[in-house]
Amino acid sequence: MATVDHREAGQDDPESEDEVYEVVDLTEYARRHQWWSRVFGSNSGPIAEKYSVTTQLVMGGLTGWCAGYLFQRVGKIAATAVGGGFLLLQIANHSGYVQVDWKKVEKDVNKAKKRLKKKANKAVPEINTLIEEATDFIKKNIVLSGGFVGGFLLGLAS
């Protein structure tokens, strides 16, 4: 943080006050005041500073297992719905109920791919900031993150 003394030229009046401005570096402020401090209060911080390694592993493992298990269940339901929809579409097409112009479908899909690639190349700065915050969180809480990944994989397998 720095201060800047601002005086107008030609003002030698003893009654005039010097204006002092405080320059705040917002990037440094944002690094010192993480998002969890704004959400959970000033007593919150990295989990590594509050809990033992064993507690972090158990917390990460349990939350990871729950997330993996739910991801597996929802994924199976979604895959069944999408696959069933394609199967019904093929049966309807084969039976003559539906006529699909596959060349037009392919053309539209390729057009959508090109648009998506163009938009993906123009990364939004907010996404980069979010990725930096997530990476910083993982680095500061590596034990918890490792437990989460292990639990997530176990949840997918169960």
Swiss-Prot record:
It comes from Tetraodon nigroviridis (Spotted green pufferfish). The chain crosses the membrane at residues 51-70, 77-98. A motif (YXXL) lies at residues 21-24. One of its GO terms (biological process) is autophagy of mitochondrion. GO terms for cellular component: mitochondrial outer membrane. Pfam families: FUN14 (PF04930). Keywords: Autophagy, Membrane, Mitochondrion, Mitochondrion outer membrane, Transmembrane, Transmembrane helix. It is found in: Mitochondrion outer membrane. The keyword Mitochondrion applies. Belongs to the FUN14 family. This is FUN14 domain-containing protein 1. Its main location: mitochondrion. InterPro entries: FUN14.
